[in-house]
Amino acid sequence: MTIHIYNTLTRQKEEFIPLEEKKVKMYVCGPTVYNYIHIGNARPPMVFDTVRRYLEHKGYDVQYVSNFTDVDDKLIKAANELGEDVPTIAERFIEAYFEDVTALGCKHATVHPRVTENMDIIIEFIQELVNKGYAYESEGDVYYRTKEFEGYGKLSHQAIEDLRHGARIEVGEKKQDPLDFALWKAAKEGEIFWESPWGKGRPGWHIECSAMARKYLGDSIDIHAGGQDLSFPHHENEIAQSEALTGKPFARYWMHNGYININNEKMSKSLGNFILVHDIIKQYDPQLIRFFMLSVHYRHPINFSEELLQSTNNGLERIKTTYRNLKHRIESSTDLTDHNEKWLAEMKEFQSAFEAAMDDDFNTANAITELYNLANHANQYLLEEHTSKVVIEAYINQLEMLFRILGLVFTKEELLDKEIEALIQKRIEARKNRDFALADKIRDDLKERNIILEDTAQGTRWKRG
């Protein structure tokens, strides 16, 4: 089955056909590193890491680029408030970002370019736009001449005249048209700066991504992604810059994830209801946070609450319990082959359904439903008196593979298994010695730890409740 992606540009699902067979060029807008990220900032890395993982699962070679904006008005403001320089603050929060998203199961991008390390190509990009008549210098600033780009507004599906009607020129801006936007900002006294043909200054936000995407992925890319809030003006402006320069389509597929609400209220710093990732992963397993985020389709908003998180945790633990019980059953399983094909064939259907969900615009919500169905199917098999090692291992491998696609892992608990086996052996010895009080105490202690014993003709079996 082919993959279909909802393209913000066309507002419809389209069959995914990359520019080069089995290769994907993917650019995801990264953070401005002036503070710790909150859970809203963390949704794009988790969502698009999962997209990348699934594409790789399907055999694509994914070139995944995600940038750091390490010089910006917000960084300059933070530096002034803290009495530190911009590079020091940027470095601190880049390190914090990696700690947070790694905990959340995100792989590093193929490249994590920084604005400050690519200033030469950014300045060259701006100069080329000036040379082509798409940009102009004004008292040390450089602005993009929006009216020169015929397709402006095509991503956000807005007419340029409607956009102009709602725009205005702010005090201190030296642009010709309210819709024009800054490509280069002249440095103010005491600000960090770089030398350029227009004097000392630094780049505007939008030009950075256009320049770095072109440097690392070429004139045209397959997927450009980010949060819904970036579609306008950031991504709209990227299209205007890149397509004006190259004359080629910038990105074939535009993907945007939805917002996060906190207790049914939009999350925002002004309301003070945002949750920092480095705080919440101290309270909850980071894998639970990721599983929760993926339990909703990426384009839909998420309502974040402790109640919903706990409910999701219950579901995740059911899957993990099934996995642990399967691991435990391997030792007591045999090489029998009766009914193997039936169970293996049914198991394969769950993988097919999982992949069908992911093929449909990376619908992780429906994919997770199939993960639950697979776990329930495995639980039915575990009720069999005799189980096959081949089938048990197939369940384990399939659960691990589907978890891996979602960026999740099963926690290894071999040591705990050995502890349980040792206690069971101690209970067997107690029963042989007719010390039934000790045997009952061991059984009850294990039950308190959610370990259920079952005495059978073949010996004592155990499972996690």
Swiss-Prot record:
Under the cellular component aspect of Gene Ontology, which terms does the record hold?
A: cytosol
Per the Swiss-Prot or TrEMBL record, what residue ranges does the short sequence motif 'KMSKS' region cover?
Answer: 266-270
Q: What class of enzyme is it?
A: ligase
- Names of the cofactor(s): Zn(2+)
Instruction: List locations, semicolon-separated.
Output: Cytoplasm
Q: What residues bear Phosphoserine in this entry?
A: S270
Residues of the signal sequence? none
Record's keyword annotation contains Cytoplasm = yes
- This enzyme's EC code(s): 6.1.1.16
What the entry lists under InterPro entries is as follows: Cys-tRNA-ligase (IPR015803), Cys-tRNA-synt_Ia_DALR (IPR015273), Cys-tRNA/MSH_ligase (IPR024909), CysS_C (IPR056411), Rossmann-like_a/b/a_fold (IPR014729), tRNA-synt_1_cat_dom (IPR032678), tRNAsynth_Ia_anticodon-bd (IPR009080)
Family membership: Belongs to the class-I aminoacyl-tRNA synthetase family.
Protein name stated in the entry: Cysteine--tRNA ligase
Quaternary structure and partners: Monomer.
Reactions this protein catalyses:
tRNA(Cys) + L-cysteine + ATP = L-cysteinyl-tRNA(Cys) + AMP + diphosphate
What the record notes about the co-factor is: Binds 1 zinc ion per subunit.
Enumerate the residues binding Zn(2+). C29, C209, H234, E238
For this chain, one GO molecular function annotation is: zinc ion binding
Which key words are in the record?
A: Aminoacyl-tRNA synthetase, ATP-binding, Cytoplasm, Ligase, Metal-binding, Nucleotide-binding, Phosphoprotein, Protein biosynthesis, Zinc
A GO biological process of this protein is:
cysteinyl-tRNA aminoacylation
Pfam family of the protein (one): DALR_2
Residue span of motif 'HIGH' region: 31-41
**Organism this protein belongs to:** Bacillus cytotoxicus (strain DSM 22905 / CIP 110041 / 391-98 / NVH 391-98)
The record's section on SUPFAM superfamilies has: Anticodon-binding domain of a subclass of class I aminoacyl-tRNA synthetases (SSF47323), Nucleotidylyl transferase (SSF52374)
**Binding locations of ATP:** K269
